[in-house]
Amino acid sequence: MEAARRDSIDFFLGATTPAGFKGYFEPLRREPGMQMYLIKSGPGCGKSTLMKRLARAAEQRGELTQRIHCASDPDSLDGVILPGQHRAIVDATAPHVVEPDAPGADEVVVSLYHTIDAEKLHQCTDEVKALFARNALLRSRAARYIASAGSLLLDSRRTEACSANFDKVRRYVKRLCTRVMPRTEGIGSEELRLLSAVTPKGEVFYQGTAQALADKFIVFRDDYGAVSRLLLELIRAEALTRGYHIITCPCAMHPEDKIDHILIPELKLAFLTDNRWHPVHLPSVQAVRCTRFLDRENLAAYRARLRFNERAAAELLEQASALMAQAKSCHDELETYYRAAVDFGKVDEAAAECMEMFGLK
């Protein structure tokens, strides 16, 4: 594994959620002025290596570089984003297929299919198709475990919500934002990224990204998510209204309706949610225990149910990660067939062309 540097900016741009695979490649495409470079190739054909090479070159030049990791294999990259250039290069193959809307204008297709000896690979058709099918089966089973865990965690969040004083939350956010986010003349804007995901290694949380982009941390400790959900939703609205560019990080388990973290690089400020799934361990944080917004006596009546949900969800996610690890092993075997049929000299030539397109040669 390529070790993440202390100041490395790492995200996911897609993950398996209770609703299936959720990707943020389309929102990335819609970011103002963004030009996308779409890599097309097979497994094990050098896509991630090409992007790692580009990321290293950009970082050596001092460019702000976002590394986008693959949730199915966090050691591999699904993309690299250079915000200063308004450019991104991404793996545009399944499960996050991206096709050009305006080829050459908004998107450039970087095809590596010409590097594959199709005749050689054709000799292994049965083995390759069987591995693709087994990989899909294992990923589908993992998704069902994640869906079951998500159902329990949602039940816990709704249970906590019945004991929450949301008016108190709203008043708190108004005071907090007045103190830490002065109004600006700018127009608010937003990037969508994931800071955590369920992976073959368990739940991976890129806490170092917050450290790279901020030096002030407001951390909401919330075991079940009902209070932090509203806190982050209101903070997002305030930040955009006050004219800031923000990086919004949805919850990997419920990305459609829950935000876990918000980063405001301009203020060097991060709002983070701390819980069992992504514990925050940072020095000098302003810690806010969300129990202050709860009727704890009322919530205590549901303690056994909440504990059961947490234990069961943890076991389900552990099984999901184990299945994802099996899927990764299957994918690794699949890559051996492709690697044997790839001309990596041609891949190196394509990588050099990409470096030139990004002005990094």
What does each model-found stretch correspond to?
Residues 2-61, 218:
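N-terminal accessory targeting/assembly segments
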Residues 39-40, 50-51, 58, 66-69, ...:
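A cross-family "folded-core" feature that marks the main globular domain of proteins
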Residues 7, 35, 182-186, 216, ...:
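N-terminal low-complexity, Ser/Thr/acidic repeat segments characteristic of secreted
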Residues 36-55, 202-207, 212-239:
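Glycine-rich phosphate-binding P-loop
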Residues 2-21, 56-120, 126-127, 239-318:
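Conserved nucleotide-sensing/catalytic segment adjacent to the nucleotide-binding pocket
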Residues 127-179, 308, 312-357:
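An accessory alpha-helical subdomain
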Residues 1-28, 167-210:
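N-terminal pre-Walker A segment at the start of P-loop NTPase domains
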